[in-house]
Amino acid sequence: MVPGEEPARELMAVLLTPRFRRLVSQNELPGPGLNGPSSRNRRDGFCRKRRTGCSGPFQATQLWDGIIHSLQAQVEIKRRRHHLQTYKDCFTGSDAVDVVLSHLMQNTCLSSNDISCLKGVHLCQVLMNHKVFEPVGMKKLFKKEKELEFEDSNISLYRFLGNKSSYDCCKRQKDAENEFNETLRPGYEMISNPLAQEIGEERIEELIHTINGNPALCPNITVQKPFLRLSKEDVWKEQTLLCLLQLIHLPFLDNILEPPVKTQNLQLNKEEDLVITNTCLDRELIPSLCLPEK
């Protein structure tokens, strides 16, 4: 290879593809250097790589796989807008042509002076016909209509098909992880206090019974009765009354042990209904009234 041929190739690539984004420099390419004894070793290694890497019955398969892989890895995939509609995971036709031409320039088996933008467009057309990617926003109305043509422009949008896109694979893995986390999330996030839950349920049942006018609560609910503190005298009275009731079954024994104040009040209440008469006063008033005697 002539020492001045490599810069000429780079200049030709820039002139042919004005949108050229990435082109490996001469030091990064696996080709030979300009001068020096080390250039022979590089040249020998380069020739060996050319013989082994691009020869054999699987040469075409390796070339196509390399083009598709570089297209999937280097093309810019993002959300884009076209004809008042938004499409996800799309790339432009001009970006695809730039990536394909960059791969052709860097590949030692395919690099030649005949590489042009038109060949890059034809190569993208072949990839689209073989369902590597599909156009977005363009559909065939009739079966007899010709195949859609690939357009080298910033307006035409395309999207990868199947599992060939590494971007789609990463996205599907993330979606699967998110779904797995969502299925496990409720079990980890739900924290309950059984004691507080039981108290809340009891209060709700109490409220429902009071609203329905049914004071009787469910048998599962236990309500503590108010505790009355009794004096020693009251306790002795109750015990004595119980012993008497066991011996003599009379109902009037209930009021025997009550204090005298209460009995007096009861007697006064009973005496209010009685009529008190004065016999002396009656004897004096009856003759004066001249009432007929019976």
From Swiss-Prot:
Matches recorded under SUPFAM superfamilies: Winged helix' DNA-binding domain
PROSITE patterns per UniProt: DEP
UniProt domain DEP: residue ranges: 71-162
One GO biological process term: intracellular signal transduction
Annotated InterPro entries: DEP_dom, WH-like_DNA-bd_sf, WH_DNA-bd_sf
CDD domains, per database record: DEP_DEPDC4
UniProt name for this protein: DEP domain-containing protein 4
